[in-house]
């Protein structure tokens, strides 16, 4: 029976999901398919690389570090994002709290991330490259409007996947999963409301406003 796991995003709330994944690792349980959105998959790759507590270590050591996140990063012309992209997706995994690329590459299953195509407003699903030491796709799936630039993924303008498909369980079923574990970062009763900032989104992204009738998830 093919088993998949779906990891919802949610910025720092996603540390809950990493606890679930770490618990699965204690039983040496890895599914055949992993898909996530935004911070869900950004943290989820450490589950696939079998690095228990890695995400917790990052959170404890760097969550209050201005290099990690802060408006100062957004004002830098070489960054243009609330998160310090080079620090988060380069320095941390390659120097400070090393990511195990070899174990990640050896995983025999599928790993996908969700992004929102800014031309269509629809979700796109891409495999996470096993040897990308810049994690470009993970940067794109975390790219909230206003707080990140638009990322080019295979010639398509992409941003945060949670805008188009926040809980991609249907994608897991499409990929042949017969059993799907869904890890949420909101309470069971949570219902996402219409986005109050939609007029600002339309103004900020005028070229996409016809197609991009989306609800940006509240973080």
Each PLM stretch: what is its role?
Residues 1-37, 45-219:
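Patatin-like phospholipase
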């Amino acid at each position: 029976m093919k088993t998949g796991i779906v990891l919802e995003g949610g910025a720092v709330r996603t540390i809950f999901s990493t606890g679930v994944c770490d618990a699965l690792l204690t039983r040496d349980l890895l599914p055949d398919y992993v898909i996530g959105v935004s911070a869900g998959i950004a943290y989820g790759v450490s589950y696939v690389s079998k690095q228990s507590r890695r995400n917790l270590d990052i959170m404890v050591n760097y969550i209050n570090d201005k290099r990690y996140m802060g408006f100062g990063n957004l004002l830098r012309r070489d960054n243009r994002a609330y998160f310090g992209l080079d620090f988060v997706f380069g320095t941390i995994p390659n120097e400070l709290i090393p990511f195990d690329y070899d174990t990640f590459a050896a995983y025999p299953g599928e790993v996908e991330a969700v992004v929102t195509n800014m031309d269509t407003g629809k979700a796109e699903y891409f495999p996470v490259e096993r040897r990308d030491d810049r994690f470009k796709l993970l940067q794109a799936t975390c790219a909230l409007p206003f707080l990140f630039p638009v990322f080019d993924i295979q010639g398509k303008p992409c941003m945060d996947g949670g805008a188009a498909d926040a809980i991609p369980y249907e994608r897991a079923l499409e990929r042949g999963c017969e059993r799907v574990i869904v890890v949420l970062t909101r309470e069971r009763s949570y219902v996402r409301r219409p986005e109050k900032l939609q007029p600002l989104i339309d103004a900020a992204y005028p070229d996409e406003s016809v197609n991009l009738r989306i609800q940006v998830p509240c973080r």
